Amino acid sequence: MTHTLYYKFILGYLLFGFLGFVTIATVSSNLTYEHLIEQKAEALYDEATMIADNCSKVYEGKYLDLATAYPQLDAVATYMKARIWIMDHSGIITADSSRKAAGTAVEGFDPTAQGNRLYTIGRYYGMFDSDVLSVSSPITGNMNTYGYITIHLPISVIKAEQNGFLNIVYITSGIIFALSLIILLIF
């Protein structure tokens, strides 16, 4: 009688560990990913808005030299692990933080496609080989929209950060699971 109860207890313990791992792998993974997407989108949008405000000063009579703007774009892009584009209203990239796409036209560019969402996820009109998180902010002046600041963060960067968080959760749950072995020692 005691052995069968003990085996059932061990089986229940192992089942609990397995279901805990599956729960962490699915629920925690999705929650972490969604949280990181929202967090990164807000940070990118704030940065895009700040850059757009600086670019808008040109239309208030102030001078903006692209030669002096590039180091700032490059520094922000490097810090955020993203690419920053300055685009005109028709979708032609006038400046690129990586200096690869300047002068390129974004085919099918539609600034209203984003709707009221803060961000989009995809390949941004086929301009990237993998999915990116993209945000854009208009460059306005004198009640007109002259262009857009778009910032693109590779989803792989977000996935790497997600995996880092999940590793911490896995290790912590493994330690808790191991510490709960004390219950088996008591019986």
What function would you assign to each model-found segment?
Residues 128-140, 147:
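A short beta-strand signature within small-molecule sensing/ligand-binding domains used
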